[in-house]
Amino acid sequence: MMQTDVLSATATADGTMVDQATRVRGITVTTSSTAGSVVLKDGGSTGTARITVNTPAVAGIQNVFIPAEGVRFFTDVYVDVTNVASVTVFYG
């Protein structure tokens, strides 16, 4: 099994989180008191949605476990956030 360093990036608005091909290995979302979502796309704002996380209408922290080798993004990792305070992506 190949091992790589795990890095992190945090965003509070839509945008590119990782500007290269990678694997997303985990996600932490700081939710607000309004239901929302986080969509991670491969290929920019119009790219393919690879991970969608719907968040509850409760302020707090939501950790998303991604098994095995993670989810592969071939181009980049772009985040589209709705009604969340922040999202941290663990990748490598």
Where does each model-flagged region fall?
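Surface-exposed, low-hydrophobicity beta-strand/loop segments enriched in small/polar/acidic residues
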Residues: 1-92
